[in-house]
Swiss-Prot record:
Annotated GO biological process: cell division; cell wall organization; peptidoglycan biosynthetic process; regulation of cell shape
Record has Disulfide bond as a keyword: no
Compartment list: Cell inner membrane
Homology family: Belongs to the SEDS family. FtsW subfamily.
HAMAP family hit by this protein: PGT_FtsW_proteobact
Name of protein: Probable peptidoglycan glycosyltransferase FtsW
Keywords on record: Cell cycle, Cell division, Cell inner membrane, Cell membrane, Cell shape, Cell wall biogenesis/degradation, Glycosyltransferase, Membrane, Peptidoglycan synthesis, Transferase, Transmembrane, Transmembrane helix
Recorded name of the encoding gene: ftsW
Length: 381
């Protein structure tokens, strides 16, 4: 580790546009977390800056981690891909054990640590991406086969999904499934295998929704939130009110009203609603633009990577950021049922922010020394 840190550090070697977007999103997220949470924090913790202080600590630790990670040769993660996947499996099991896993609103998604709640599903996302990149690189010539190229990934995915649904965490489960399928498709897996797996999975998804009261309520709230405006439809209705009140230019930073105990999870999953109310359509468009640039740069890094492992590692991270951002934005605007997915870099939460910044560090290391080609061009090698 010390040898890595002693190496000459040349910032110009890395993708500075990607770095700028991440710094901007993280910094803006800290400001909005304070704006969205100060009143609630003052009431519940007698400290309006309670969540601000914690998010600042998470951001500082995450930035230090990203700075270290961006200087570690990404090839190192090839050796750690399988061990880290096993670690994620162990963590997903531990979170289900009473006394170790902490329950919040009926879901066991966190492992209680001193001063911090670890969310294993966030760690699992990056661990699975590393494993997928490592395995795809290892079996490139067999990726189009069913028994050797497709089914092993489905077995791993099913184990992870089973543990996630046991928590339950449908949002993380669907995210992992989408990332896996997209990476396999990009690797050359036959489309018939993917479509077939989707047809097999569909009855199980329907069963999980129909036989779960809270999931069924979420679907009903998505289809017609006004049917129960003071119950299950309350959150999405208040979110829409926030966007409507913001108009084009917003009410002004800190001047939003929905965060005053009207909009649940205002500083976490629904932070974009607060941004929409306080900074308006312009503010939301700026956020969407920054995410677009971030994902675009990550895709360019994937295209320009010098080896298959680096290419799919960058691709997986790019897809993860894209899915999380798009799904979160769709949920808060009422286009998707609520899923419990954080908005990367912006929502309050230590696990999400730390893992996101760690993933950015990996992307930056892959980008070091690359000539990044435009998305419409050929791979730069």
């Amino acid at each position: 580790m010390l040898e890595i840190l002693r190496k000459p550090f040349r910032l110009a070697e890395y993708d500075l546009v990607l770095l700028l977007m991440v710094v901007a999103l993280t910094s803006f997220g800290i400001v909005m977390v304070y704006s969205a949470s100060s009143v609630m924090a003052a009431k519940n913790f007698h400290d309006g800056a309670y969540f601000l202080k914690r998010q600042l600590i998470f951001a500082l630790v995450g930035c230090v981690g990203a700075l270290v990670t961006m200087r570690i040769d990404y090839q190192l993660w090839r050796r750690w891909a399988v061990p880290l996947l096993f670690v994620s499996l162990i963590l997903l099991v531990l979170v289900l054990i009473p006394g170790i896993g902490g329950k919040v609103k009926g879901a066991s998604r966190w492992i209680r640590l001193p001063g911090f709640n670890l969310q294993p599903s966030e760690f699992t996302k990056i661990a699975l991406i590393m494993y997928m990149a490592y395995s795809i690189d290892k079996k490139q010539d067999r990726i189009r086969l069913l028994s050797a190229g497709f089914l092993p990934y489905m077995v791993v995915l099913m184990i992870l999904l089973g543990l996630l649904l046991k928590q339950p965490d449908m949002g993380a489960a669907l995210t992992l499934a989408a990332v896996t399928i997209i990476m396999l498709f990009a690797a050359g897996t036959r489309l018939i295998f993917i479509l077939g797996s989707g047809m097999v999975a569909m009855p199980f998804v329907v069963y999980l929704v129909v036989h779960s009261a809270y999931r069924l309520k979420r679907i009903k709230a998505f289809l017609n939130p006004e049917q129960d405006p003071t119950g299950i439809g309350w959150q999405i209705i208040q979110s829409k009110y926030a966007f409507g009140a913001g108009g084009f230019f917003g009410q002004g930073l800190g001047e939003g009203k929905q965060k005053l105990f009207y909009l649940p999870e205002a500083h976490t999953d629904f932070i974009l609603s607060v941004i929409g109310e306080e900074l308006g359509f312009i503010g939301v468009i700026v956020i969407i633009g920054m995410f677009f640039i971030l994902v675009q740069r990550a895709m360019r890094i994937a295209m320009a990577a010098q080896d298959t492992f680096g290419r799919f590692l960058a691709l997986g991270i790019a897809v993860l950021f894209a899915i999380e951002a798009v799904v979160n934005m769709a949920v808060v605007t009422g286009l998707f049922p609520t899923k419990g997915l954080a908005l990367p870099f912006l929502s309050y939460g230590g696990s999400s922010l730390l893992i996101s910044l760690f993933a950015v560090g990996i992307l930056l290391n892959i980008s070091a020394g690359l000539k990044l080609a435009p998305l419409t061009g050929k791979d730069a090698k």
